[in-house]
A protein has these predicted regions:
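Hydrophobic core positions of alpha-helical segments in small-molecule transporters
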Residues: 15, 43, 74, 101-104, ...
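Structural motif at transmembrane-helix junctions in multi-pass transporters
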Residues: 32-39, 84-104, 177-182
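Hydrophobic/aromatic residues within transmembrane alpha-helices
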Residues: 30, 40, 44, 89, ...
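Loop-to-transmembrane alpha-helix entry segments
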Residues: 64-70, 99-102, 118-139, 148-155
Length: 196
């Protein structure tokens, strides 16, 4: 029997995935209605920053300059550059292409982690699970209709976004355990806004 708290977390995860999945289509609609990728990013991060402020009071800065620079790198790679390249990709490529390519970010991250850290090797079980999850996501996105619509500029921008997310993941791995998640998230929003 699932406990109430577990149920709450599952609902929160489902809500998060739904919102994340809707961003590709909603961004495409906003671009079609004359908003630029930078404007979309600015609106998204400004709203997120304002929403997180009540939960992230207290500490304003990291404990040292090195950590503050890592937080700035996270805001740049996982904030402004990631979302700008993703939003720009949606100007040139269908949302289905962009979402599929961006969803390869965990694979790139796992590959790089296995090259950089000996203890981070992907097991066969994880590789099979990742492949099955990706195949399932492809089936959902394509909805049973496979139409190959290449858009080199958009597809390369989407791949750039996936690789930027890989960099962001590595930066967060280096700093993750030293600060509360809400502090890190607020700083990522802050530096993302600052570097737009």
């Amino acid at each position: 029997m699932i406990k109430y708290t577990e149920y709450k977390y599952h609902l929160a995860a489902l809500f998060t995935v739904t919102v994340w999945g809707a961003t590709f289509v909603s961004t495409k609609v906003l671009i079609a209605n004359s908003l630029t990728p930078a404007e979309i990013f600015l609106l998204r991060f400004a709203m997120a920053y304002v929403c997180i402020l009540p939960f992230a009071r207290g500490r304003m800065w990291a404990a040292n300059l090195r950590d503050e620079l890592l937080l700035a790198a996270a805001g740049l790679s996982g904030g402004s550059l990631y979302f700008l390249t993703e939003n720009m990709a949606l100007e040139y490529a269908p949302a289905s292409n962009v979402s599929l390519i961006v969803c390869t970010a965990p694979v790139w991250t796992a590959v790089l982690l296995s090259l950089l850290y000996r203890g981070e090797r992907m097991t066969r079980r994880q590789a099979v699970g990742s492949a099955l999850a990706f195949a399932g996501m492809v089936l959902v996105v394509l909805n049973g209709r496979f139409v190959l619509r290449l858009s080199p500029r958009g597809d390369m921008l989407a791949l750039s976004a996936a690789l930027l997310w890989m960099v962001y993941s590595l930066v967060i791995k280096r700093i993750g355990g030293r600060y509360p998640a809400v502090f890190i998230t607020r700083k990522v929003f802050f530096y993302g806004l600052l570097t737009i």
